[in-house]
């Protein structure tokens, strides 16, 4: 299939986005509006216009999505698309770390995943428990005239499980603080308010985790992002090298980016052609620190950006979209786009309430049998 055939498959709004010549572009893509198809068309269009595929970097949130985009571009352009890069934010940053290790003063490092982090925090909690046990034993024993007198406390001491969050919760708290770029104290208030009295103990555990990583030359996923983001914002030589190889940056699912990822994108503004796609009316990674301001305030942060809208929905009927539009109209945020159904009219949605998920499942099965 030629690029002309691909462009002919797009609707006018998709085609305008795919072929824009703006330096910076934000595409507000409503649900089911062909977002991925538009990104594929954008990459294919750039290559067809003479842009070397190796100068295009696409970043998204899953390896599967990245692989799908590259495969679809290759299906349209064949060998012409060879060298096109699509990856997650972490893989993109990891490639920079490994290509320029001396810049980051990293002579050698090992990447640890979430399971490794959980195990490290589990061991740190164990050390904390041992320390408390020794302190409690010292307090409960007093020596007088060569004899040891043991006093029975009225109330049993809290266990470490009661004082500190679970290892998984500590990992999530640590990551949330890094990704939102807020202090540990504020992250604790937002994520685990019930553990605020243990702030000093949690802070000590976090310091222990940082010390162990440094000692063992470990980098977790948050380190990978923050190392690269910080250095790109402060090291002109590194930024020059990276932007030489990345002249076109396409960002998928912009609404799910967090403050740390925005910090990573900032240095590219003005040096690369930035093309961001996302839905300003949805976000599924709030628990990871996703910040809707990255998309809602994009025009303020990048004043020369062109903002385009994809509002033709290919997934739902108009009755479903009318309900969605009605909800968005009542939001405090200003949503300018209104989704229109390509499929036309349909059945008006009906609200059903259930006592539990099993009743819900039984209803769905019963309803499907009737259709």
Walk through the language-model features, giving the residues of each:
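Conserved P-loop NTPase-based nucleic-acid remodeling module centered on helicase motor cores
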Residues: 55-60, 64-165, 352, 365
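Helical mechanochemical/support elements of P-loop NTPase systems and associated helical scaffolds
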Residues: 65, 69, 88, 117-120, ...
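Basic/charged alpha-beta structural segments of nucleotide/phosphate-handling enzymes
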Residues: 118, 122-218, 236, 274, ...
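Structural preference for long, well-ordered alpha-helical segments in enzyme cores
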Residues: 17, 39-46, 57-61, 65, ...
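Phosphate/oxyanion-binding loops and surfaces in catalytic or ligand/nucleic-acid-binding neighborhoods
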Residues: 76, 99, 103, 127-131, ...
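Conserved helicase NTPase motor core
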Residues: 8-19, 23-27, 65, 85, ...
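P-loop NTPase Walker
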Residues: 1-107, 240, 322-325
């Amino acid at each position: 299939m030629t690029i002309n055939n691909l462009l002919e498959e797009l609707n006018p709004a998709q085609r305008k986005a795919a072929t824009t010549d703006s330096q910076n572009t934000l595409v507000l893509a409503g649900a089911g509006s062909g977002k991925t198809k538009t990104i594929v068309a954008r990459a294919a269009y750039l290559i067809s216009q003479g842009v070397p595929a190796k100068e295009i970097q696409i970043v998204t949130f899953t390896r599967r999505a990245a692989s799908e985009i590259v495969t679809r571009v290759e299906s349209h352009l064949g060998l012409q698309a060879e060298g096109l890069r699509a990856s997650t934010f972490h893989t993109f940053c990891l490639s920079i770390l490994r290509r320029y290790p001396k810049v980051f003063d990293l002579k050698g490092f090992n990447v640890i995943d979430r399971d490794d982090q959980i195990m490290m925090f589990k061991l740190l909690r164990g050390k904390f428990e041992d320390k408390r046990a020794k302190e409690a034993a010292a307090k409960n024993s007093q020596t007088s005239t060569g004899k040891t007198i043991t006093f029975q406390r009225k109330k049993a001491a809290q266990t470490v499980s009661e004082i500190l969050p679970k290892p998984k919760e500590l990992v999530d708290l640590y990551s949330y603080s890094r990704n939102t770029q807020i202090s540990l104290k504020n992250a604790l208030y937002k994520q685990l308010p019930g553990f605020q009295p243990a702030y000093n103990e949690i802070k000590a555990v976090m310091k222990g985790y940082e010390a162990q990583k440094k000692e063992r030359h470990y980098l977790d996923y948050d380190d990978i992002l923050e190392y690269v983001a910080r250095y790109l914002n402060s090291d002109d030589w590194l930024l020059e090298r990276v932007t030489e190889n990345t002249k076109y940056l396409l960002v998928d699912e912009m609404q799910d980016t967090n403050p740390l990822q925005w910090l990573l994108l900032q240095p590219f503004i003005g040096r690369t052609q930035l093309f961001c796609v996302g839905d300003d009316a949805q976000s599924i990674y709030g628990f990871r620190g996703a910040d809707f301001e990255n998309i809602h305030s994009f025009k303020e942060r990048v004043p020369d950006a062109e903002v385009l809208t994809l509002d033709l929905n290919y997934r739902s009927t108009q009755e479903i979209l009318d309900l969605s539009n009605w909800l968005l109209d009542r939001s405090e945020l200003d949503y300018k786009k209104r989704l229109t159904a390509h499929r036309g009219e349909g059945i008006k949605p009906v609200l059903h309430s259930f006592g539990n998920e099993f009743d819900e499942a039984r209803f769905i099965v019963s309803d499907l049998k009737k259709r």
